[in-house]
Structure formats: C-alpha cells, structure tokens
Swiss-Prot record:
It catalyses: adenosine(37) in tRNA1(Val) + S-adenosyl-L-methionine = N(6)-methyladenosine(37) in tRNA1(Val) + S-adenosyl-L-homocysteine + H(+). It is found in: Cytoplasm. InterPro entries: DNA_methylase_N6_adenine_CS, rRNA_Ade_Mease_Trfase_CS, SAM-dependent_MTases_sf, Small_mtfrase_dom, tRNA_Adenine-N(6)_MTase, tRNA_adenine-N6_MeTrfase. Pfam families: MTS (PF05175). Its EC number is 2.1.1.223. Specifically methylates the adenine in position 37 of tRNA(1)(Val) (anticodon cmo5UAC). Keywords: Cytoplasm, Methyltransferase, S-adenosyl-L-methionine, Transferase, tRNA processing. This is tRNA1(Val) (adenine(37)-N6)-methyltransferase.
C-alpha cells in the first residue's frame, strides 16, 4: 500500500513487511548526528534509508535480500529527493558483508535495522512476510556479528525489537563486545506494558561493559485521550503528513 510522508513517498506493494509504526519510530529516533555513512540492513521498501536521508547528509547503502522488495526500494529511492545519496544493494547480508570488508567501504558510522523477530511457531503463509518477520532468515547472533564487523570504532547501530525478543537479544551483546548506549521503551498508551524497545548499540571495551545496565527512557505512542502523545508528535512530526 503506498504511503505518503511529508518529503517522500513509499510504495511497499512487494515488501514482506509494509510501512509500520515500528519503522517510523526507528527512523525518527536513531541518533544520526555526525554520521557520514549509514547502512540500512533489511531495507525493504527503503523507509529507513529515506528517513535517514531526510535527517542527515550521509551517504547511505540500503541492503535488501528479496528481489521484489528491492524493486520497490529502488523505485522509492529514484522518486525521492536523495537518489544521489542512497545506493541499493540486492544481496544477503551474510554473504555480502565478508566481501564488503575487502572493499574500500568496510565500516559505517551508523547501522539501521528493523530485524526479523519471530523465531518460533508457524510462519506466515506469505513467504515474503514470513521471511521479513522470522529470525530463521537472520538470527540475532548473525546480525550482531555483522554489526560488530561493519560498525566503525565510534559508530552506533539502532534497532527496534518487540518485548518478547529483548530477553534473548541483550545477553548476546557481551559475546560480540557491543553495549547499549541508549534505550527507549515504547508503550501504546499510558500505564501499559512496553511492547517495543528502541535500542542504540556501540562498541564495548570489554564483555563486562556490555553487561552494564543503562536507564531506559519511555515513550507512549498515545495519551490518555487516545490521541498521539506530545512526545510522539515531537518525534515524528517531520514525517507524518497530519502532524
């Protein structure tokens, strides 16, 4: 379904996962200050790449494994004001990044990823949606290994995860000497339990540093009246048409 933002348009007709609040939250929140190079892992329709291009002057590489989703991504890039700064790569991350390390651009100032998150249970009947949503196609340890290798020494990686995945994801950081540098717990309304978590990762000096707790911020998407909260409006108003 086509989706129009303030400065760009997204057609996600062939993508396993359509434009979602998760993606918009991640694209609006990721700390891109001073990032000159950005990698978007699992770009899908190109939403995160386009949001990053609007928010920064960075050169962006959008990596997408699915050929049909990659077609949507390229179309959306071509129709945007930033086609000169976004390059689509149609490839499997696990096959691509070892080769990328032999080339000039081997590390990135920022990495964006809205990763697969269902790792058990029956997969969707739609194979594209299943691939986009299940960690069978990209396990967390594989993702973190790639981030570890591709992230510049002072770089950051931003992700969004559902609450059910957080307990499995965070203990893996120590294995790859990565640490949380920021976290926002997302609720749908006040006094609700968090359903999503925005995470920002950076390199850790030691495994012990990986395990250090940080204080999480909190964001409620809607207020008590059911309208978008002030915090949600402040975060996303540069993108959503009606805010």
């Amino acid at each position: 379904m086509p989706f129009t933002f303030k400065q760009f348009h997204v057609d996600d007709s062939h993508c396993g996962m359509p434009v979602s609040t998760d993606g918009v939250l991640l694209g609006a929140w990721a700390p891109l200050t001073q990032a000159k190079t950005i990698l978007d892992i699992g770009a899908g329709s190109g939403l995160l790449s386009l949001m990053a291009a609007q928010r920064s002057e960075a050169v962006i590489q959008a990596l997408e494994i699915d050929p049909l989703a990659a077609q949507d991504c390229q179309h959306n890039i071509d129709q945007s004001p930033w086609s000169d700064r976004i390059t689509l790569i149609q490839a499997d991350l696990l096959q691509w990044y070892p080769l990328a390390q032999t080339q000039a651009q081997t590390q990135f100032d920022h990495i964006l990823c809205n990763p697969p998150y269902f790792d058990n249970g029956p997969q969707s009947q739609c194979s594209k949606r299943a691939q986009a949503r299940h960690t069978d196609s990209l396990a967390f340890d594989q993702l973190l290994s790639a981030i570890k290798q591709l992230l510049a020494p002072t770089g950051k990686a931003s992700l969004i995860l559902p609450n059910a995945s957080l307990g499995r994801f965070l203990p893996l950081l120590a294995e790859f000497k990565l640490k949380l540098s920021a976290r926002v717990d997302i609720t749908t309304a006040p006094n609700k339990a968090p359903q999503r978590h925005l995470l920002c990762l950076s390199h850790a000096v030691s495994s012990a540093e990986s395990s250090e707790a940080i204080e999480a911020e909190h964001l409620s998407i809607r207020d008590a009246s059911g309208a978008y909260s002030q915090a949600m409006v402040a975060l996303t108003q540069a993108f959503y048409l009606k805010l």
